């Protein structure tokens, strides 16, 4: 998401200016059930982000097995990262779903009208298939990665222009879905269509300016026609924030009323150590369930930095966490990870949970909203399970 969009959302949500600090003990939601894995065997794990004593990494349960009764476990990755030693070992042990972080978006695939480059996406699919990992497709329509050729043309006659652009969208969606037919179990069809501004419902993207909400219908209908068996999702960030969730549900209700073939909602869940509360996550999932749809968590990470809203316009950002501040932030992060995972397990409608990355050595949050080291994932820079990992797999684990 763009800096300004993220900033506006967090301002609306009342983001704090401090890294959240949590008291001792396990805290948080926890859950019972799920797969195996014991935390009884402990050793001093070497970690690039922490020096606390954690269970022996060799005792870590495979996440895909631990949560097998609940949902798929996924991670976002591109081919270059998937082949690196740290990421490769984690992926092969822990996941049964991967999302293409960038190589299935329209700007790398849609070279020009009718000309496609599937090479990188095909490489990722081949890796997944060779290792019995399923693929989530991401994303067929996103305003930030729509090539300019979609919108080229004479706008003097808007009826003809709209027909031209609609045809390009439908052809692109059809061709891409057909290319990956039988290889992708779910598609994020449209991504981030909800306004962050409370005075509007829809994001004022170029797609919306041309078509209003109709472009959503065109994309979904084309995807469903190309592959009636694949699950189709609308993907959004900020569904855990009440105001934006209300606007998003207005969009979703309109889609349902119009008969758009939507299977479920992708909740990005880019959160931080101070926001949201478990009740906010529960409200988002419950609202989707009430509409008869399924839930996927599509891009989860937990930033160490509970920045003020002004940080997203470049001022007031917290300094890079080191030493005792880092230890405090990692403690808070583990407790924050535990809370939503307990909520996910409590909702049978949650069918897939994906983190936006594999380990802390590669994360978009190292450069967003400013350049500083972040540690937002379940595995540290060396690929070892962090406190956050143990917090979600063991409800008795006392977060150090």
Regions found by a protein language model. Name each.
Residues 1-17:
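N-terminal secretory signal peptides and thylakoid transit peptides that target proteins
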Residues 76-86, 107-119, 194-196, 238-248, ...:
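Acidic-and-aromatic substrate-binding clefts and catalytic sites of carbohydrate-active enzymes
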């Amino acid at each position: 998401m763009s800096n300004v969009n993220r900033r506006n959302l967090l301002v609306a949500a009342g983001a704090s200016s401090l890294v959240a600090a949590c008291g001792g003990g396990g805290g948080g939601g926890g859950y019972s059930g799920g797969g195996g894995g014991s935390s009884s065997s402990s050793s001093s794990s070497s970690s690039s982000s922490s020096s606390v004593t954690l269970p022996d990494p060799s005792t870590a349960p495979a996440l895909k097995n631990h949560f097998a009764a609940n949902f798929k476990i996924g991670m976002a990755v591109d081919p270059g990262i998937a082949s690196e030693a740290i990421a490769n070992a984690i992926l092969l042990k822990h996941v049964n779903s991967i999302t293409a972080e960038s190589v299935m978006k329209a700007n790398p695939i849609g070279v020009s009208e009718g000309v496609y480059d599937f090479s990188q996406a095909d490489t990722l699919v081949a890796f997944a298939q060779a290792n019995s990992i399923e693929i989530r497709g991401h994303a067929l329509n996103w305003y930030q990665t729509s090539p300019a050729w979609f919108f080229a043309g004479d706008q003097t006659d808007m009826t003809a222009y709209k027909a031209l652009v609609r045809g390009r969208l439908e052809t692109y969606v059809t061709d891409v879905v057909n290319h990956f037919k039988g290889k992708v179990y779910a598609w994020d069809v449209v991504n981030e269509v909800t306004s962050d501004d409370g005075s509007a419902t829809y994001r004022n993207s170029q797609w919306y300016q041309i078509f209003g909400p109709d472009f959503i219908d065109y994309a979904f209908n084309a995807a469903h026609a190309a592959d009636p068996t694949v699950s189709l999702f609308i993907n959004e960030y900020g569904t855990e924030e009440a105001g934006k969730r209300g606007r998003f549900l207005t969009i979703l209700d309109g889609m349902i009323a119009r008969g758009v073939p939507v299977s479920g909602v992708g909740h990005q869940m880019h959160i931080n150590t101070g926001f949201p509360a478990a009740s906010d996550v529960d409200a988002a999932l419950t609202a989707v369930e009430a509409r008869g749809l399924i839930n996927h968590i599509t891009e989860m990470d937990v930033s160490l930095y509970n920045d003020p809203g002004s940080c997203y316009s470049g001022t007031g950002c917290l300094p890079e966490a080191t030493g005792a501040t880092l230890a405090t932030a990692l403690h808070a992060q583990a407790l924050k990870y535990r809370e939503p995972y307990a909520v996910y397990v409590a909702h049978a409608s949650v069918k897939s949970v994906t983190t936006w990355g594999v380990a802390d050595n590669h994360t978009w949050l190292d450069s967003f909203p400013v350049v500083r080291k972040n540690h937002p994932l379940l595995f540290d820079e060396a690929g070892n399970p962090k406190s956050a990992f143990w917090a979600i797999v063991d409800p008795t684990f006392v977060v150090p």
